[in-house]
Amino acid sequence: MAKDIYFNEDARKSLLSGVEKLSNAVKVTLGPKGRNVLIDKKFGSPTVTKDGVSVAREIELENPFENMGAQLLKEVAIKTNDVAGDGTTTATVLAYAIAREGLKNVSSGINPIGIKKGIDHAVNLAAEKIRQSAKKITTKEEIAQVASISANNDSYIGEKIAEAMDKVGKDGVITVEESKTFDTTISYVEGMQFDRGYLSPYFSTNKENMSVNFDDAFILIYEKKISSIKELLPVLEKVLGTNKPLLIIAEDIEGDALAALVLNSVRGALKVCAIKSPGFGDRRKAMLEDIAVLTGGVLISEELGLTLETVEIEQLGQAKTIKVDKDNTTIINTGNKEQIKERSELIKKQIEDSTSEYDKEKLQERLAKLVGGVAVINVGAVTEVELKEKKHRVEDALSATRAAVEEGVVPGGGSTLIEVAMYLDTIDTSKLSYEEKQGFEIVKRSLEEPMRQIISNAGFEGSIYIHQIKTEKKGLGFDASSFKWVNMIESGIIDPAKVTRSALQNAASIAGLLLTTECAITDIKEEKNTSGGGGYPMDPGMGMM
């Protein structure tokens, strides 16, 4: 296919035009007075959102060169969302500001490589300053403040997230689901829950809700299938002597082994229940090891030289409470706290080393089941459109809150970026080249843009207020929702440090790519043949009658 090629100024101008269009669509959502964006869907009702990354994801431009610029900027929003969970609009505004100011300098003949070096130098100093300025958050109230701001100043959502995080801990899993009612509620699952139910309803001890409820029970954790009752007899006899219930977890239990267990359960000879192992493949073995650690038992595996016939009562796990229904099993643990902590640290290390988002998610779930449990926020709303928008906000707020717990918080509303710009003013740049100094200055000017946009969305002129902030004492900022000068931290207007830092670093990265682009290549669209010509071609041998 033939290609269209733009060089030099033409390439950069076209890319910047696309960046500007996407930035204009996204920046209107910034701040407490940010506006909604309505997104058409081919099927169903349109989506209403104030989420920058949701707007960015939807944008495709007709001009292929402009579209390339827009897609680069979209990458800023998506990457920031993936890393920090919020700050996508801030990142977009910063990236456009750095690219716009940088391209002015490139157009005047300044070497873009030198400009990029200066930008990188300033951003590295700024990122370190943000890290140093961060204040650790510890209280439930501070967590609620962060969550409320990220949920577009919805204090109810903020309180629900803080409540969930307080219950399950910072390593616990909090999931967001759609509620079947109009209300937003939280439900909790203590201990370890996994999606495996009983192998036979005849195991149930509560006939009303068809569930198995055991207290102070033993757990046999076996890696392979069990098909013969003879293999199980030795361990069953040992458990029978203790008069305690037994939960059997194995790859599968079939044949006369399952039949004998059901018969014993129905007759009341032994309180027993059998379930299949959770997970698949390598993950199955890891989850069985988690259950063993959680319950203080041993995974009975031939690799370790252990067989069913030789199992001792000390090798069985123990649980305070076990609940099994047709779909799920919940185990409330009594395991060794030290062993659980060691296992948790191992999983945290695996999360850090993993490059797959799917693997990270599964490891995080395993960690939560070990240390705290799972909280589910059920989001309710009156209409489907409102439900989608609200669920987006809750997910954003949850991600931002996790980022805040991880790296701490800084004053919000763009005031931290202004303070960082003032800090960069104090840096000695005499050893930098002329081009690098220009790049350094570009970052300083661009750091004002997010606050300027927040104030603009509130209906005021940003430049006046930015000048005033620079002369006020540290920590003061403009509250765009109440139109007052306030101490940002004391007023609860805070941003996660990780969000602010990631937004700046990702913005500078993509802006640097735009500045150093000298050529852009895209496919030439083929014109579709619109000439008539329906019907069959005439046979050349056929003449007119």
Swiss-Prot record:
One of its GO terms (cellular component) is cytosol. The keyword ATP-binding applies. It holds the Pfam family Cpn60_TCP1. Its EC number is 5.6.1.7. It is found in: Cytoplasm. Belongs to the chaperonin (HSP60) family. Forms a cylinder of 14 subunits composed of two heptameric rings stacked back-to-back. Interacts with the co-chaperonin GroES. This is Chaperonin GroEL. It comes from Borreliella burgdorferi (strain ATCC 35210 / DSM 4680 / CIP 102532 / B31) (Borrelia burgdorferi). The gene is groEL.
